[in-house]
Amino acid sequence: MKTVTLSRLNAFKHAQEPFSCLTAYDASFAQHADAAGIDVLLVGDSLGMVLQGHASTLPVTLDDILYHTRCVARGKQRSLLMVDLPFMSNADTGQLLRDAGALMRAGAELVKIEGAGWMHEGVRELTRRGVPVCAHLGLTPQSVHQFGGYKVQGREQDDAQRIIDDARLLVEAGASVILLECVPAALGRAVRDAVDVPVIGIGAGPEVDGQILVMHDVIGVTHGRPPRFAKNFLAGRDSIQAAFEAYRDAVKTRQFPAEEHCF
């Protein structure tokens, strides 16, 4: 299988071929996901919840992210490696550049930033310096307290238009990828059509360019009630590898997400 690059993700978009993405936090699971043909691996600050047991992603530090990035970078071969900037890494431009540079040195190939249109100057500064950026819009978990919980975003027309406008602004500033979380399926489609870069969705409907899930949801080990957009692909299968392959195939054939996974 070919190595996945940003150019390849763009080719997937233009060919209308959905691509699969999955979180990974260590070398072993990265090897399994890579071998299963998962196109993008994300070292997400979700590790704060699924690995460290926190109630949110806010306590995750840059050192935490760097440790897991190095682990995943050693385990993967062909998948593109995307990595989260932790909470408040974008407090000012200097810190943003330093933290993003540290992630790239650790093995990141795409740096993900949560926020909204106000990030455009930071995105511009990063891309000027050769750091590829994924802009995370919609439900941004680092803003959970501002949102008042993990709630679907963009239900109202004004909010939906703001997200579309933010996506356009951030792509104009240089963002290479947009990630949409927990928005109505119609908004996912609208953002996909509004920008010429790949749009990855998690709870954003079936008509975005790629899908991402947290690995723990895919193999059914999430504590408590799983999110609506998740599916246990290990159920009825005998290995984690088979679960990852089933997820990949379901995304490629547009069988996932189904209507019950959408807002």
From Swiss-Prot:
Co-factor binding details: Binds 1 Mg(2+) ion per subunit.
CC annotations in GO: cytoplasm
Pathway(s) served: Cofactor biosynthesis; (R)-pantothenate biosynthesis; (R)-pantoate from 3-methyl-2-oxobutanoate: step 1/2
Keywords for the protein's UniProt record, in alphabetical order: Cytoplasm, Magnesium, Metal-binding, Pantothenate biosynthesis, Transferase
GO terms assigned for molecular function: 3-methyl-2-oxobutanoate hydroxymethyltransferase activity; magnesium ion binding
Binding site for Mg(2+): 45, 84, 114
Protein localization: Cytoplasm
Domain of life: Bacteria
Binding site for 3-methyl-2-oxobutanoate: 45-46, 84, 112
Cofactor annotation: Mg(2+)
Top-level EC class as recorded in UniProt: transferase
Active site, renumbered: 181 (proton acceptor)
Major place of residence: cytoplasm
Annotated catalysed reactions: 3-methyl-2-oxobutanoate + (6R)-5,10-methylene-5,6,7,8-tetrahydrofolate + H2O = 2-dehydropantoate + (6S)-5,6,7,8-tetrahydrofolate
GO biological process, one term: pantothenate biosynthetic process
HAMAP family noted in UniProt: PanB
NCBIfam families given in the database record: panB, PRK00311.1
Protein function: Catalyzes the reversible reaction in which hydroxymethyl group from 5,10-methylenetetrahydrofolate is transferred onto alpha-ketoisovalerate to form ketopantoate.
Subunit structure: Homodecamer; pentamer of dimers.
Family indicated by similarity: Belongs to the PanB family.
Designated name of the protein: 3-methyl-2-oxobutanoate hydroxymethyltransferase
Organism: Chromohalobacter salexigens (strain ATCC BAA-138 / DSM 3043 / CIP 106854 / NCIMB 13768 / 1H11)
Lineage, highest ranks first: Bacteria, Pseudomonadati, Pseudomonadota, Gammaproteobacteria, Oceanospirillales
Underlying gene: panB
